[in-house]
């Protein structure tokens, strides 16, 4: 057995259900990714926030990554349970103070606010038109400034060449 000096308790990353999943499937999947732990023995279970009942969940295999391990677990809940808080409970020998790690998954708001599409579209169209006009104006302004600089350069060059030609006819300035 290899002992690591660093903190090797599980580091959680949580993933919440997508809006598309909750609308199409009428359910949501919470995913808990646990990384950088050692040794590989780990127990994971899920519960609702104020309940001790263990919920049915699934787990991936424990995978070795460099000198540590990673594992993921997921819980799929029906639409009616999405407004409840859920917990992923992780038991590992290197948890701080030997206490089970509790990862909280917030409730998912399933109500969607609808807006009048006519109001929103006309505002977006006006904003787009204004942005387009601003960009076009800026483009033509820079083009005009560039043209002015080229004309100015040509005039100065002609003046300097005439002066040089006039001065070089035997006269010294």
Swiss-Prot record:
It is found in: Cell membrane. Keywords: Adaptive immunity, Cell membrane, Disulfide bond, Glycoprotein, Immunity, Immunoglobulin domain, Membrane, Receptor, T cell receptor, Transmembrane, Transmembrane helix. It comes from the Eukaryota. Its main location: membrane. Residues 10-104 form the Ig-like domain. Gene3D superfamilies: Immunoglobulins. Gamma-delta TR is a heterodimer composed of a gamma and delta chain; disulfide-linked. The gamma-delta TR is associated with the transmembrane signaling CD3 coreceptor proteins following the stoichiometry: a single gamma-delta TR heterodimer associates with one CD3D-CD3E heterodimer, one CD3G-CD3E heterodimer and one CD247 homodimer forming a stable octameric structure. Upon activation, gamma-delta TR complex associates with FCER1G to initiate intracellular signaling. This is T cell receptor gamma constant 1. The lineage of its organism: Eukaryota, Metazoa, Chordata, Craniata, Vertebrata. The gene is TRGC1.
